[in-house]
Amino acid sequence: MIRGATYCLKGHFVSAEDPPPRDWDQIQEAALREFDEDQGRKLPAFCTDCGSENISTCNRCQKKIAFNNGRRPQYCGWCGSPFPWTVGALSAAREYTDELDQLSSEDKTALKATFDELTTDTARTPLAATHFKRFMEKVGSPAAEILKKIVETVLTEAAKKTIGL
């Protein structure tokens, strides 16, 4: 049984379902708790940090978002679709890249091409992270720091390590 999680559209963690019960007493307690929750004690519809709508299912396939011990997923495990917080961060990074006067249009295109690779652990992730790091050296601070902050929330641990975050 998959343990579900609730996040807001911007990616703030809201809650996780209780772990599955292990014995009959726990099953009964969980059933009573669910009954009580259905009588009015539900999660808020909106995030208390930012006011965005809370979701517990994928917008595309409607399957529940799997809880992964506090590690926010970037993509749906059922259909592979990016979650809204992933789309939002990548969109903001692309928009910000277009504003960087230090880069040519070819460089901007190449930098934007690294973003998707930085959100998944593949054989191309270290290469994309190395390219990203080079572009950050080229644009310099504070632009590089701003762009790093935008993408940091959706990068894999391997990408963060290579980039130095």
Regions found by a protein language model. Name each.
Residues 1-144, 162-165:
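Short amphipathic alpha-helical segments that predominantly mediate membrane engagement
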Residues 145, 150-165:
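C-terminal, charged low-complexity interaction regions
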